[in-house]
A protein has these predicted regions:
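Periplasmic N-terminal accessory/gating domains of Gram-negative outer-membrane beta-barrel systems
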Residues: 18-19, 41, 47-49, 79-80, ...
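Flexible, solvent-exposed coil segments and beta strand-coil junctions
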Residues: 154-155, 171-173, 241-250, 303-313, ...
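Face-selective signature of the C-terminal outer-membrane beta-barrel domain
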Residues: 334-348, 380-562
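Transmembrane beta-barrel wall of Gram-negative outer-membrane proteins
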Residues: 250-357, 387
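Flexible, surface-exposed loop regions and adjacent strand-edge segments
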Residues: 50, 89-91, 224-229, 298-309, ...
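Periplasm-facing N-terminal accessory domains of Gram-negative outer-membrane beta-barrel systems
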Residues: 1-71
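N-terminal secretion/transport leader regions
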Residues: 1-5, 33-38, 59-61, 69-80, ...
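Outer-membrane beta-barrel proteins
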Residues: 106, 164, 176-190, 245-263, ...
Length: 562
């Protein structure tokens, strides 16, 4: 291109480099003429005089603009949310791992990690049973990890944390490893389920989501809610503490509500920066979400003896509300594309509260002259918190030697604050409170502190195949402290009132005045336990690929459990 500097006049040469400038915009005077072409240095001819009516001929020769690059580095971050990337990883993996990415989960309408693993072959979910079965093996034979670190359970009866704790808002992938390897957990017979948290993909991200919905069952029903749980799902855990005072803070009578709307709010965002003279990548990613949903179900409970005799036949109505909040933060730093440092923080709060009313025959409980008929009301809230802090690093020491290390500190608080169970038997005039330990309030709390550390040194071996051969030596440590306390208040009936199921109030009976008058008594029982667990694991593992069809994986591991 040819241009008169300081004007809009210009032209483009033909294939032989010839050009002509004339017409509007070219006036008499002195001009600097600029010549540009791809692959050549820009040439400027100074002080060329242009006169009216005279032809000016210029012969210009451009110099080649040749530059030699020492090297070209293309930096890319793989997107493990994508199904194709996960399939490529599984194809090249030495240990068979099945993984599901968040894009596939979104397409299939899956909302949490429990639903994700149910999509994997050999994994099943049984209604009414917590967590999943892998090849028929339940909770005891499986293990759960988060970004490769073990994570404790929020329930003292279970080894693994409930997978529905983890919504797809914070999941990048869910992997299921059914094969044993030296670097993994030794306490696994079914599978290790690893949940990988989200991280920033690309240069930047920002998203706000709001959704709502309703369940037709909850819209047309007077929805019952238990007392003692606020709008954020935080339960009141206050106990009376003394047997001679009835000062429970929460009511025994649930409240009625209508027009229950499911709602979900979420925001996520992140940004990638390049810092320092080497333009090292520094990124952060944040997620926060709140969810509230309602469910209503009508149930039939029927139990029989071995010879087919029915001893329990009840119908029930269950009102359930689930409230959860989550927050995720990820900070990631790459130094010269060889050293990697990352920090992950996650907070999950999950509250499930339910009111269940069951009416009918139960000869094991209501054993009397009125056809063993009775009524049971069960009010329960499970209020759980999970805090996770993880620091991980990976260093490329040489072209063949790398070092990785990490630490994770988890805090779990699982509580069942003020579970209320009341049983009423059918009588001639209506219903009366059942004697014995049938009227109960129960408080429990589990506090678990879990520290995990790991380190490994990997030496890459040369082979003629895909260069996956290596020798690895490593250490894993886990140090757990559990404290559990359960307090049970049995409110034994001495003189019962008569109730009608249509409009009965238990608060009218259970109060300080009736306790003082001897209508009922309170017995308080406390159970506690403390567990300390230290696990040290050291291992050596070797992988060598002989050809495209043969790979050797050999490992030795030592575990010490105190």
């Amino acid at each position: 291109t040819i241009r008169l500097v300081g004007t809009q006049a210009g032209a483009v040469t033909d294939l032989d480099g010839n050009f002509e400038l004339n017409g509007v915009g070219v006036l008499e005077g002195m001009y600097d003429i600029e010549v540009k072409y791809v692959g050549y240095k820009t040439e400027v001819r100074r002080k060329v005089r242009v006169e009216n009516g005279n032809l000016v001929i210029l012969n210009l020769e451009l110099e080649t603009d040749a530059q030699e690059l020492a090297d070209v580095v293309v930096v890319a971050k793989k997107n493990r949310e994508n199904e194709n990337m996960l399939l490529l990883e599984q194809q090249k993996a030495v240990i068979a791992v099945q993984a599901v990415g968040v894009k596939e989960l979104s397409r299939k309408g899956v909302s949490d990690a429990e639903g994700a693993v149910s999509k994997v072959a050999g994994v099943s979910k049984q209604e009414g049973v917590k967590n999943v079965f892998v090849r028929g093996l339940g909770d005891r034979y499986n293990a759960t990890t988060f970004n490769g670190f073990p994570i404790p359970s929020e329930d003292p009866e279970y080894k693994n944390i409930s997978l529905d704790f983890f919504s797809t808002d914070i999941i990048q992938t869910v992997g299921v490893n059914k094969a044993f390897n030296a670097g993994g957990s030794s306490d696994v017979g079914g599978a290790n389920i690893d949940i990988t948290s989200k991280e920033l993909i690309g240069g930047g991200h920002f998203n706000i989501g709001v959704s709502g919905g309703f369940n037709t069952q909850t819209l047309t029903t007077d929805f019952l809610k238990m007392d003692g749980v606020n709008l954020l799902g935080i339960a009141d855990k206050t106990q009376p503490g003394m047997e001679n005072n009835y000062n429970f803070k929460n009511s025994l009578d649930p409240s009625e509500h209508d027009l229950q709307i499911n709602r979900n709010y979420g925001v996520s965002g992140g940004k990638r920066f390049y810092v320092g003279p080497q333009k090292d990548a520094l990124s952060f990613f944040l997620v926060a979400a709140h969810n509230t949903e309602y469910q209503y179900a009508e149930e039939v409970l029927r139990n029989t003896t071995t010879n087919g005799t029915i001893y329990k036949d009840q119908t029930g109505k269950v009102y359930e509300q689930k409230i959860s909040q989550l927050a995720l933060a990820n900070l990631d730093y790459d130094y010269r594309n060889r050293h990697h440092l990352s920090y992950n923080f996650m907070m999950v709060h999950d509250n499930v509260q339910s009111v269940g009313d069951y009416d009918g025959m139960d000869s094991g409980k209501f054993n009397d002259d009125y056809d063993n008929m009775g009524f049971t009301r069960r009010q329960q809230a499970n209020d759980n918190w999970l805090l996770v802090n993880q620091l991980m690093t990976n260093w490329g020491l040489t072209k063949t030697l790398s070092f990785d290390a990490g630490a994770s500190y988890n805090v779990v608080k699982g509580s069942e604050p003020d579970r209320r169970i009341n049983n009423l038997r059918k009588a001639a005039e209506g219903y009366t409170l059942l004697e014995g330990n049938s009227q109960q309030r129960y408080f429990s709390e589990l506090n678990e502190n879990d520290l995990n550390v790991k380190a490994g040194l990997t030496y890459r071996l040369a082979d003629d195949q895909e260069e996956i051969s290596n020798i690895r030596i490593g250490y894993n440590g886990r140090f757990v402290n559990d404290d559990f306390e359960a307090t049970e208040y049995n409110m034994t009936v001495a003189h019962s009132s008569v109730f009608r199921l249509e409009d009965f109030s238990l608060d009218s009976y259970y109060n300080q005045e009736n306790l003082k008058n001897g209508w009922f008594e309170i017995q308080r029982n406390v159970d506690k336990y403390t567990v300390k667990k230290d696990i040290h694991s050291a291992y050596v593992e070797a992988v060598y690929q002989f050809d495209a069809a043969w790979i050797l994986n050999l490992g030795v591991k030592y575990d010490r459990v105190d």
